[in-house]
């Protein structure tokens, strides 16, 4: 069978008349490496290889390049166009293809630079080139993604939209700290990633549901298209979306294994089924199982009937076991009828890795001609069941093999090996749609309905020691009384459990392959309309108990933001290799809704970045204050430092520690208020420059003010040297705003500077020239600034001046000046503070008194000298005029006398 050259041809549209050439509006479109092939390959890679590290990254680069090749070839657009019968307008199509080609070219350049850097990761030039190409690629994708959500074309462009989102998410995982990006950039990208994952997910699910509703109709032909849309968009959209959360490397820092438990359905294996059965869509859909716990298909007992010499599959019974074979085998009710025209035949499904393929033979006859519907016989007269295995395990055959191949609808995930090894799904259940005369035991239609589950949903709940294991709770052995299985929201990879009253949720049989000494911690992915308490136990032994918050409002639909991952901090170990894990929900009022998607078992030795970040943030916040009651700030805590602690808190994971994050955020806001209260500057954030003549900041015209960025949360100023003067900004603090006999420091943060001069002036001038190497270049300036003897090795600066007695009559004040005196100078600074420290005492006080006396003596001498010069100048001016009104010159006044008087006036000193 595997030697057949046609077996590997995966035709995704078996409802089309010619599988080799698809015809859409007169246009010939060749099939080949289809979106389904790409998506299945991608899903396999993410499920089997998703672990941080170079191997994952390099494999991802290859897959992304293949994705771009298919995206830009129009295939993803054609796929959904055919399913929903909506052709994208030519301008929108051409625009999308053009953008995809541009992104493809950009990605090719980036991928090459990434490979070169990966081969020589210590080479700074290669790393910088890779970073440049990454930023270009990231910016282009970020800009392009909203353009693939075109109004009126959200559904046709859905696969393109989701796949591009996948690419940008994976790139954020690829390029982290080891690529040389600073912590602020990494945190910014992480925050963007976690936010965008939710946006992408909700967009994809919303428009998937919109498209699904659009293709629904009453007849069998409509159901075929409906089912194909559901199946193919599950493979190309929903499966990938369900794995988006694993990109959060702070929550999943090691290899993480997920499982897809949703089921998809091949079309009923009947001839002429897509066009002849009116009003049957609802009945066909009703033949599919409602949401249920996953079970393991053990066997199918098939019954045979005959009509006018034609033998066919008339009915069957299913034998199945719970996951992990953890309970007795159970039998489903009979599907169809128990025909006896031939001996019943039992197909054993649990050989190898289960049934991965069916090859069916259809039988179509029109033995009746009754009424306007022209009744027909449409049945199945044989099926071959092929087993997934690494060896040539013989197939099981009911009567005979056929040509209708399930792989045409659900291709393998790996086309580089035989389908029996590279298959993507296995048979999970068989139901039946039947229709016929009400007064006859012979049905017109006997249509077995094959259900398929992804191969990642393994038979046993295996928990190893070296990975995070995600187990959907639909793999439970038993449900607690009051727990039900409900349809999943589309982004969880399967159905979920629901409770509306306190009690046991479910029991889960798990098999431990690690030594029993291995310790684990449990996490739960849940949504709830109420605060509640989760309890866990193993083999009846209580393990964990914890209180958790509501995540959604009553009456709201489940969205990605409704689900939250929470965990217990206390580790535990299993006592037996095969154990029963029990989860319960308590301490909430009946009538609320609690949804549980999965349980995660995490090796206890794994240090989560989220936990480390929380501990670091808690320590940083507590160290801002002088005591645990947060009454006052420590003197050495700067305004800039508070902003950085705020960034630290902002980067905490909402899923892991939302309540702690809110509490820490309030403490940081309180610290910021205390910082503002002690700051004597009227305008520390440069919001009112040049607004008041007598107070506030004054600046020259070539100084700019910018808003917050990765370095400054609030406004900062930029000074650039020019040919036309020296840019400066200054402020004066008046006497009545300053306490006597206090040291007065000015401090702040300089992101980078060259030839920045800082002056602090009262009795005398404190002056410092500051060079601080920065990280971001200014246009023509190079990012590397040579560090000389006058360079600051810290971005923080502080100058202080001692304030003596403040005198109403003197109005001396304190001047703060920042200035650039060279053409190539520049500076970027913010978070300025003017503080009052402890009163001066002892020698410091005596030193200030001496400086103050020296300044007063000098001032008195200057005043005495100035008065003498003033009197002489006034006498010279008075002698020029005939009266004190200075409106008429003396008759003998000449130009020499006027120049002499002017010279004396200009010799007067300004006090």
UniProtKB/Swiss-Prot annotation:
Gene3D superfamilies: Galactose-binding domain-like, Pesticidal crystal protein, central domain, Pesticidal crystal protein, N-terminal domain. GO terms for biological process: sporulation resulting in formation of a cellular spore; symbiont-mediated killing of host cell. GO terms for molecular function: signaling receptor binding; toxin activity. Keywords: Plasmid, Sporulation, Toxin, Virulence. It holds the Pfam family Endotoxin_M. InterPro entries: Cry_V, Galactose-bd-like_sf, Pest_crys_Cry1Aa_dom-IV, Pest_crys_dom-III, Pest_crys_dom_I, Pest_crys_N_sf, Pest_cryst_cen_dom_sf, Pest_cryst_dom_II. Belongs to the delta endotoxin family. Toxic segment of the protein is located in the N-terminus. Promotes colloidosmotic lysis by binding to the midgut epithelial cells of both dipteran and lepidopteran larvae. This is Pesticidal crystal protein Cry1Af. It comes from Bacillus thuringiensis. The gene is cry1Af.
